[in-house]
């Protein structure tokens, strides 16, 4: 009897000493930091780690558009754009102003990607930005689900 009481007390004290589970934070501040303030590589690292796990990390990459038009890898930019839309909706923040901000960030991400082409490859940067402009146009026209 004494042994079972000691074991029960020991087990309960171990449970009390264990850290309490913390609530996952994927609120507006975290979402905005990953979306608007972090580099695309920092965003991708968080996405690959699914950190924080309560964010909606799902993505269909560049939807029905090619993920890599003419070899330009737009996937990370498309994934961050999806993150903005999905988590904006999840947090009930998805207004037209918010959508425009996410879309503008998408264009900036694409242009930043295109800026890697310089010197003898500067023509690729020009071509890449033209594709970026097309992708931006379509998210503005069709991103709300109302495509002509």
UniProtKB/Swiss-Prot annotation:
Active-site residues from the entry: 81
A cellular component term (GO) from this record? extracellular region
Question: Which cysteine pairs are covalently linked by disulfides here?
Answer: 62-78
Cofactor: binding details = Binds 1 Ca(2+) ion per subunit.
Q: Where in the cell is it found?
A: Secreted
The protein's job, in short, is:
Secretory phospholipase that catalyzes the calcium-dependent hydrolysis of the 2-acyl groups in 3-sn-phosphoglycerides. Increases the ability to utilize host-derived nutrients and lipids, and promotes lipid dropplets accumulation. Plays a role in virulence.
User: Where does the UniProt annotation place the signal sequence?
Assistant: 1-23
Residues bound to Ca(2+) are 82
> Needs which cofactor?
Ca(2+)
Major localization listed first in the record, in broad terms: secreted
Provide this UniProt record's keywords sorted from A to Z.
Calcium, Disulfide bond, Glycoprotein, Hydrolase, Lipid degradation, Lipid metabolism, Metal-binding, Secreted, Signal, Virulence
Q: Which GO terms describe its molecular function?
A: metal ion binding; phospholipase A2 activity
Q: Which Pfam families match?
A: Phospholip_A2_3
Species this chain originates from: Arthroderma benhamiae (strain ATCC MYA-4681 / CBS 112371) (Trichophyton mentagrophytes)
What is catalyzed by this enzyme? a 1,2-diacyl-sn-glycero-3-phosphocholine + H2O = a 1-acyl-sn-glycero-3-phosphocholine + a fatty acid + H(+)
Please indicate which superkingdom the organism of origin belongs to: Eukaryota
Give one GO biological process term: arachidonate secretion
Q: What is the protein named? A: Secretory phospholipase A2
Protein family membership:
Belongs to the phospholipase A2 family.
- EC annotation? 3.1.1.4
- Residues linked to a glycan: 61
């Amino acid at each position: 009897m004494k042994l079972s009481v000691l074991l029960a007390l020991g087990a309960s004290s171990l449970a009390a000493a264990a850290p309490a589970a913390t609530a996952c934070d994927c609120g507006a501040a975290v979402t905005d930091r990953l979306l608007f303030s972090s580099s695309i590589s920092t965003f991708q690292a968080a996405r690959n780690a699914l950190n924080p796990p309560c964010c909606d990390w799902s993505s269909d990459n560049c939807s029905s558009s090619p993920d890599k038009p003419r070899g330009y890898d737009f996937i990370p930019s498309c994934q961050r754009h999806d993150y903005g839309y999905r988590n904006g909706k999840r947090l009930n923040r998805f207004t037209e102003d918010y959508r425009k901000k996410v879309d503008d960030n998408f264009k900036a991400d694409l242009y930043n990607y295109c800026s890697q082409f310089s010197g003898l490859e500067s023509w690729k940067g020009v071509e890449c930005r033209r594709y970026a402009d097309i992708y931006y146009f379509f998210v503005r026209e069709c991103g709300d689900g109302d495509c002509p």
